[in-house]
Amino acid sequence: MEQVIKMDEELSRKIKFLESIPAISTVTATIVIAETAGFSLFTNAKQLTSFCGYDIVLKESGTYKGQSRMSKKGNKHIRAALYMPALTAVRVNPTLKPFYNRLKPKKAKPMITVVAVQRKLLCLMYSLWKNECNYDAEFEQKKVARVKALVTQDRVKNEFETS
């Protein structure tokens, strides 16, 4: 498997982007890329999550509204490949650890939060593959800081205009 990756320079370069995510190994990246045909079949992350079976379905009939659950109609190989990386990510990934800890008290079953982390990992892999960039652990913090700066700037501007 590693020899095939080394033979294709572009594939090797793009897999390095995915491996920059803590908890994603060469094997996991290769399985996801092989099962999704290099993400070439998808135009957005929502299509990808649906393909993998991470989409949510509702059971409804008339006035009855059942619980929502994961469809599992998608690719079981990707879900199986992302299970262990998700468990590792909640321990070592600086972005996914707070995400997991925030969801954990809200959910009755711990597996629900692990599946949410799996979905987030998959979307992150898709984004890095499409944008051809390495994982940046501070990306979320930088984004929040930019939004806070804009909000503060707007408040100051509004106070100045009303004065």
Can you say where each PLM-predicted feature lies in the sequence?
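A detector of single, family-specific signature residues
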Residues: M1-S163
